[in-house]
């Protein structure tokens, strides 16, 4: 959800994911709102991608986790398109791409099917690579055809800022 507080926009991506898990499914509406704000409001984009706040990483992480959870959902095409365009817009920022080097919380990694056994850690870049690979390779091509260009462009935009992906990201 997005709220304005004392003139500053704060992104609360975690609440989107929590509501998704509760079955209220506002994910598509949240993705549409994020896409519209990121495309039409430069101040919002600057705030979300600001290295001081790093608000884009939780937003992207929540969207990637929901995309991964909806791999088999044939009705999630609209959500996947909105989420992929949000990721594409965020990837235009070098600060956001650099922030993807941060270590992903184990709970987030588990939602993407990434192993955390033995203290193994993954970066947000690893999670993004894993989810994009799963979406583009494990789903029916006719469903994911509109997502190929934005998702591959997202990876291409962000990759130069990554400090070496982990085992999952480099596989």
Regions found by a protein language model. Name each.
Residues 46-77:
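Amphipathic repeat-derived elements
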Residues 59-65, 76-171:
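Eukaryotic scaffolding regions of large macromolecular assemblies
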Residues 1-22, 63-75, 127, 131-139:
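Acidic, Ser/Thr- and Gly/Pro-rich intrinsically disordered linkers and low-complexity segments
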Residues 1-6, 10, 15, 19-28, ...:
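Elongated alpha-helical scaffolds that mediate protein-protein interactions in large eukaryotic proteins
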